[in-house]
């Protein structure tokens, strides 16, 4: 794989993924197909004026997904003490179209990638927390799409369950990578398997036709040397930076120390976004209820 400083454009990332899929270590990675309902949802949401009836039809085509939407709409974060919603239409009105699509995307992704390994026990819980935090932050920062931020937060580490399902010995690698202090998590993954969860996750994003900026951000979320580069794609830099903030906020909520990426690159991310510690503390307080609800 080429270095992060050579992947300053989205096109460079996409070309690297395509080469690795054709001739490199990604040839034998089994990527779950994108769920048909998610493909339909993506098509509906890509229209200049999305068809609300089509989104509702997709939602009601799966009983469990309908129940998930109703539960989200009736959660403290959205109900504000109001009467409980009882129909998908009511839930969509309360949540709004973008949040409705985000809840549906999370449900469908979770169904497509079953996680049974104990090493990944809280995978979807933490992915959902990250997505919630990122959309919250994006709404408070200029020029960042809350929809893209939520999608990136949800899929950021999706390479892990994919590798756990299709790469022999990967669960052992996860244990080793978490324990080692002499090299990073992705360095251990690459030493053992010639690829890592950031690359595999980016491939999932590409094959599932997520936004190119999301694909590039997933690919680069642990290769942070280019984070402060002016020539790097600003949308990708913004997503990766907000992702670092979200991870810091999550770990603080879980009473954990900041991770290594934050220790080294947190100040750069804050500088890129033009924020300070007071902003972080304010957002931490704002997110408590949302984190507890996940």
Per-range role (PLM):
Residues 243-294:
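C-terminal appended segment following the main domain
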Residues 1-173, 179, 183-258, 262:
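Conserved alpha-helical "signature site"
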């Amino acid at each position: 794989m080429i270095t992060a400083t050579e992947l300053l454009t989205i096109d460079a990332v996409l070309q690297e993924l395509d080469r690795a899929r054709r001739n490199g270590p990604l040839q034998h990675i089994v990527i779950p197909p994108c769920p048909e309902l998610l493909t339909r949802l993506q098509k509906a949401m890509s229209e200049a004026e999305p068809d609300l009836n089509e989104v509702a039809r997709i939602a009601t085509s799966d009983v469990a997904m309908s129940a998930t939407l109703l539960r989200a709409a009736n959660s403290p974060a959205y109900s504000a003490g109001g009467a409980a919603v009882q129909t998908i239409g009511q839930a969509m009105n309360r949540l709004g179209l973008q949040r409705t699509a985000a809840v549906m995307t999370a449900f469908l992704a979770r169904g497509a990638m079953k996680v049974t390994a104990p090493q990944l026990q809280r995978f979807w819980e933490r992915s959902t927390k990250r997505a919630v935090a990122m959309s919250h932050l994006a709404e408070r920062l200029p020029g960042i799409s809350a929809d893209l931020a939520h999608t990136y937060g949800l899929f950021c580490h999706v390479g892990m369950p994919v590798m756990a399902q299709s790469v022999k010995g990967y669960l052992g690698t996860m244990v080793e990578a978490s324990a080692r202090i002499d090299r990073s998590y992705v360095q251990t993954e690459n030493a053992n398997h010639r690829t890592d969860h950031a690359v595999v996750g980016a491939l999932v994003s590409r094959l599932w036709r997520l936004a190119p900026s999301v694909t590039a951000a997933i690919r680069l979320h642990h290769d942070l040397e280019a984070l402060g580069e002016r020539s790097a794609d600003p949308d990708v830099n913004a997503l990766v930076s907000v992702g670092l903030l979200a991870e810091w906020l999550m770990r603080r909520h879980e009473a954990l120390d900041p991770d290594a990426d934050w220790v080294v690159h947190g100040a750069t991310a804050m500088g890129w976004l033009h924020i300070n510690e007071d902003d972080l503390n304010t957002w931490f307080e704002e997110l408590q209820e949302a984190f507890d609800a996940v």
